[in-house]
Amino acid sequence: MSHSSTQVRRVYDPLLRALHWVIALSVVLLIASSQLAEAFEHGPYETAIWNLHILAGYGLTAALMARLLWGLVGPASARWQDLWHPAVWKDSLKRLRLPNAHRVGHDPIASLAYLFAYGVMTLMVVSGLGLAASEFQAGPLAAWLGNAGWLEDVLEDPHEAGFVLMLGFVGLHMAALVFHQLRGERVAQSMVTGKQYLDAERGVQHD
């Protein structure tokens, strides 16, 4: 992308960017702590690591709830409509081609991955709160589910499946960022500065 053909737009608001990074940090902590807890199973640090895991889960829960709300009342680029592009998805599937034009706001194809990730994170939050209550007698559901030992067997498999799916999303997300960066497309910077860098030569789509 040549600098002469680049349009710079301020698109992503500060709260959206802050929530993005809180969610990202929470997910990294959750992944790391779950693996460390397995590595130190039955060791002196296992309980402390699981407590960190639960705290990171609270952080993800709060940030995800705020993001869901901000998607309803926030500015245009933060709203759920900005992630919902069924016509573009149908056209891309029909032609087996990605859209050529850059779009102001979230990329329509990447939006599918984001919606998938939000769905997986919701599953992780619900199952995680249930597991924290039934296994560790911790969290807001402990008063109701603290003695429901049977719930561990019900929630453990969905929680672990969500972990695998989330790990796949993180890997795909990082690979896509590297790919765009190698092509000279400054996608990663958008969630730092709030600015979107659009290639005018490819066309800029407005909704």
Residue spans for each PLM region:
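Membrane-embedded alpha-helical bundles that constitute the cytochrome b-like, heme-associated redox core
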Residues: 1-207
